[in-house]
Amino acid sequence: LYQKKEMDDSTRYKSGSDHSAGQWRRDWLLSLLLVIVTLLAYLPAWNGTPIWDDDAHLTKAELRSLEGLGRIWTQPGATQQYYPLAHTLFWVEHQLWGDWPAGYHLLSILLHCASALLLVRILRQLQIPGAWLAAAIFAVHPIQAESVAWISELKNTLSGLFYFGSVLAYLKFDRTRNRAPYTVALAFFICGLMSKTVIATLPVAILIIFWWKRGKLSWKRDVWPLIPFFLLGTAAGVFTAWVERNLVGAQGADFNYTLTERFLIAGRVIWFYLGKLIWPLDLIFVYPRWRVSQTVWWQYLYPTALLLLLIVLIRLSRRWRAPLAGVLFFIVTLFPVLGFLNVYPFRYSLVADHFQYLASLGIITLVAAGIALLLKLGLHWVRPIDYLWCLALVTLLAILTWRQSAMYTNIETLWQTTIERNPQAWMAHNNLGTVLLQKGQLDEAIIHFRKALEIAADHADARANLGSALLQKGDVDEAIVQYNKALEIKPDYADVHYDLGNAFLLKGQLDEAIAHYKKTLESEPANADVYNNLGLVLFQQGEVGEAIAHYQKALEINPQFVQARANLAWALATSPQTPLLSAVAVKLAQQANQMTGGANPAILQILAAAYAQNGKFSEAIETGHRSWQLAIDQNKTALAEALRTELGLYEKNIPYRVNNQ
């Protein structure tokens, strides 16, 4: 099927000046139309705010400098996943438009459009019918919404662009055997691997294409030039698997499958993706997680049916190689996510729409070519409506994508929609609870955390978040119970040790608080918040020198840490052990006050105490009165009462001392 004499684009366009000009105008018009339709299909996501792990993928504050850019490349673990080129692009985007979400979304959409346009060129060079239809389906198919509308999946759209660029250059090398296009293809492949290593399957995909074109493979012509691609892809894949396991966390009970069970997963995954590609309804951000067991007989039906399909296609390949080639491309490109390798999202579900971003091309191309051939043959039931079939199909897919991309408007909508479509998604309940917790809707948050624990009682995250909600609600004892249960599941959970330290600090159990803060530092030695809180506890215990040292360590880690700066100023201003440092206390308090715009009554309270320690009682009284008035305006009654006491001392030219001093 499709076995025709090869001709490149230049040969085709030189067949006649009128035809070349007409072809050129038609291509530009179709390109513009494809971009416009794709932009409109993703319109609801244009201003979508960051969701789920976007904050972990977007450039962290500590990586936004040139030094941070260097760490992106040289320090695995500095970013959530080691994809340095993708994170470099995030870094550049942050320099250009900061936290403006539309910039990130529009770039991903345009990268996706560029890939679709490159796909047209590739299919034309391979002389596969329906190139524009295949590109349009790829561009607006709703299965791609997760890759395009989710900021983090710039990894997919960027690596996809390099994937297509590499294939296009390699096809030119295959025709000319010149070194230049080969070098370009290899360079694009390397760039793609540094964006997302899922494209490591590219050399196998190229061999499938060559087998489809020629009916056989030659070691010297076809395989040998791809050896560097295989070596680089394998090395990148092994490294990524190590990162997923050791740095991202793709290990533990959720990943304990036998080899037989992994084959069962693979068979089911392939049919699942094929089904969603053909019938793209009820797409979910987190699909139900299957219970896979090698003792359940019906789970063997999936790999068995796949094997039978391949046998049929192999027999048909004696006359028509295209169907087998398309299915093999689909399966091979899916290989990294078929279950044989551990990837972190498997913790929540064994399937995800963005996993088949590139693999979908195997089926899309078959469908588009089939439609194009039917139109060309002019069958009686096709002729009356001609290309309206194609227009209707693309329009329908674009509408579905428009609806699907609306799910990515904001994080709350994402989790609510996920729960509506998959009520048993414990992760969605947990994450929606986190959103509600941040909004101060504690009762609603607690409901979702408890629902998450009903579904998955052994997950430490939901248990820890329930503890945090209870702590904010004032139920300190029950919060401590939940935190301890979380630690039973995950003993080295640094965040929970930190939260437990805070809970014990509220209860006045200072030794317990110190123990948990120190446990946190074992896992997170550069956590400025922990050093600050340790300083608070030590100061309450009268260990002023130790407290000051911990505040200074917090500021060393994060010089913009206002609270640590204020706490250090308070320790210096209210301790009789530090009279010679009163000027330092004033300077620190002034800096903290400037950083908060002079609108924080607690910071002004510290500045007043620093002035008093320095003997500047008139400034202390003036600043104390400003602080008192702000506290009254902000309904901070306890702070206002404390300030009345302190002002009474300043009026007598007496500096304030904390009770334990």
What are the functions of these language-model segments?
Residues 421, 455, 489, 523, ...:
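Structural marker of alpha-solenoid helical repeat scaffolds
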Residues 426-437, 461-472, 495-506, 529-540, ...:
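Conserved alpha-helical positions within TPR/SEL1-like repeat arrays
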Residues 578-583, 591-594, 598-601, 613-617, ...:
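Terminal, low-structured helical/coil segments at or just beyond the last alpha-helical repeat
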